[in-house]
């Protein structure tokens, strides 16, 4: 049990570093307030051991505050760029990288999870429906994965995607906002409000 707890802690610490790094990178486009929100999310991830992710309904209610914001309408060129970037993600390669984060899971299990996150993220960008992506994380927890490990793998996958983006700055900004919205919604309702009030409106 002690070993498992140690692996979990390591996963959360490394995921937290990855999200903070992603916040710094995307914060170059979105500004210091975004970096601060990403840092807050990263700190929450780091301390998530023993905690539970929010329910699907609560998380979706938070996320919908962001996606319903008219300023978050994504034009076709940006949407295509973001979908394309997901299509180019090598799930095995990403799982290997994430496998270095911790012994809390097997790389083979993560490949399948990366594939699912990719598939549901593409659906989110293409249809505007992020429910399937949120249900995916919930299904991991229902299958017996600790909330903290589920949050860690999920956040790390999205963070690795965001860090790999070689797309136009506006598209990077959109991906960054959505990543913070999706991960933040699983942790606390406050992140949606912060993104809406401090990042999205001023950016447009």
UniProtKB/Swiss-Prot annotation:
Q: Which Pfam families match?
A: Colicin (PF01024)
List, alphabetically, the GO terms of the cellular component aspect. plasma membrane
The membrane topology noted for this protein in its Swiss-Prot or TrEMBL record is: Multi-pass membrane protein
Top-rank taxon: Bacteria
Q: Which cell locations does it reside in?
A: Cell membrane
Keyword Transmembrane helix in annotation: yes
Name the keywords, alphabetized.
Antibiotic, Antimicrobial, Bacteriocin, Cell membrane, Membrane, Plasmid, Transmembrane, Transmembrane helix
Give the transmembrane ranges. Answer: 139-161, 165-187
Q: What is this protein called?
A: Colicin-A
Give the source species.
Escherichia coli
The gene designation is caa
């Amino acid at each position: 049990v002690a070993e498992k707890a140690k692996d979990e802690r390591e996963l959360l610490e490394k995921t937290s570093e990855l999200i903070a790094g992603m916040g710094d990178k995307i914060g170059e486009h979105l500004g210091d307030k975004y970096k601060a929100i990403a840092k807050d999310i990263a700190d929450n991830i780091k301390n998530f051991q023993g905690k539970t992710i929010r329910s699907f309904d609560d998380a979706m209610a938070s996320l919908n505050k962001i996606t319903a914001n008219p300023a978050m309408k994504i034009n076709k060129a940006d949407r295509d760029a973001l979908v394309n970037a997901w299509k180019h993600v090598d799930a095995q390669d990403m799982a290997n990288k994430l496998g270095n984060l911790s012994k809390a899971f097997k790389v083979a299990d993560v490949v399948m999870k990366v594939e699912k996150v990719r598939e549901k993220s593409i659906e989110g960008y293409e249809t505007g429906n992020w429910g399937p992506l949120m249900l995916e994380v919930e299904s991991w927890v229902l299958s017996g994965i600790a909330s903290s490990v589920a949050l860690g793998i999920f956040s790390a996958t999205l963070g690795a995607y965001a860090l790999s983006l070689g797309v136009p700055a506006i598209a990077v900004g959109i991906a960054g906002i959505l990543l913070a919205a999706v991960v933040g919604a699983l942790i606390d309702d406050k992140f949606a409000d912060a993104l809406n009030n401090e990042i999205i409106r001023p950016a447009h």
